[in-house]
Amino acid sequence: MKVIHYIPSLDRSSGGTTAYMQLLTKELTRLVELYVVSHASENPVVIDNCTVYFIPEFRNFMGMKRQWRILLTQLQPDVVHVNCCWMPACAFIQKWAQALGYKVVLTPHGMLEPWIMARHYWTRKLPALWFYQKAAVMKADVLHATAESEKENLLKLGYNNRIKIIANGIDVENIEMKSSWKRNKEILFLS
């Protein structure tokens, strides 16, 4: 099976989704032929065991579309997995893949939680919902939630009920167990 993961940024400063991609690719490459597509950055993380492609950014709309379609034609993936919301590039990556007949999984990474939706609702979220985000969620072949609570919140939106829960993993390889425990008696006061 061939899988393409799209993530808007692999830069170290991008936080959680970038760290998630590093952990995911480490394990997923054991099971599938994996490709990651993103946009160039000054300080990208290292993604091992898969091929990483960088395509033009959204501001170079036609270049981004051309490169993405070329990659889809060359790689012929079984699944395209889009990681992120609230960025037009993510919605267009999904739209172009589905226009060519590819199945798309959308992972919002908690970005559709009620508290995120409420933040800057009138100035950012509502326009994005009107222009691209609602359609992207509705048309995704599968939504990937990382917890039951995320699934419940996605269902409350009413946009798409094709939701699967797959929890994020934890890499315990480099965690050392403490060999000795010192017992401290402390009083904690909360007011």
Range-by-range predicted roles:
Residues M1-N43, D48-T51:
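N-terminal subdomain of nucleotide-sugar transferases
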Residues K2-I4, H144, S179-S191:
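Conserved donor-binding/catalytic core segment of Leloir-type glycosyltransferases
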Residues A40, S149, G169:
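Carbohydrate-associated surface elements
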Residues V45-L71, L75, V79-P88, R119-K125:
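A short, charged, and often flexible helix/loop element on the N-terminal side
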Residues V79-P114:
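An aromatic- and histidine-rich active-site surface loop
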Residues V82, A145-T146:
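Short beta-strand scaffold positions
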Residues A99, L112, K125-L143:
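Membrane-proximal helix-turn-helix segments that form the acceptor-binding/catalytic region
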Residues L155, I165-N184:
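Acidic anion/phosphate-binding donor-loop and adjacent secondary structure
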